[in-house]
């Protein structure tokens, strides 16, 4: 893993990535801003499950990835889940920016 990925892994461990559930006191509505489904809270786990981010694909099953891999002692598992988070967070930022631009 590179330094950027190590920093992301630390942020995931410490629940510091920018999702509403990590900063509950700052938000009255914890709904995912990407899928806007009131049944899904904006959490780290939901990022790996959000149908809008995944485009309907079940990447977790395909790559045999688990959210708990961020806490694993297996560096390969950690690296795989961090790379997936990197891609999904990047896609999330892109979607949020496109929506802001469209407003």
Kindly give the residue locations of the regions a language model identified:
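Family-specific functional microsites
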Residues: 1-103
């Amino acid at each position: 893993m590179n330094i950027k990925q190590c920093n992301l892994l630390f942020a995931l461990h410490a629940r510091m990535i920018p999702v509403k559930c990590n900063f509950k006191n700052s938000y009255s509505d914890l709904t995912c801003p990407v899928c806007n489904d009131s049944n899904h809270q904006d959490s780290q786990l939901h990022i790996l499950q959000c149908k809008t981010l995944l485009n309907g694909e079940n990447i977790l099953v395909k790559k045999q990835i688990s959210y708990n891999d961020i806490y694993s002692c297996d560096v390969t598992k950690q690296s795989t889940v961090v790379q997936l988070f990197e891609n999904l967070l990047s896609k999330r930022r892109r979607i949020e920016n496109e929506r802001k631009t469209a407003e």
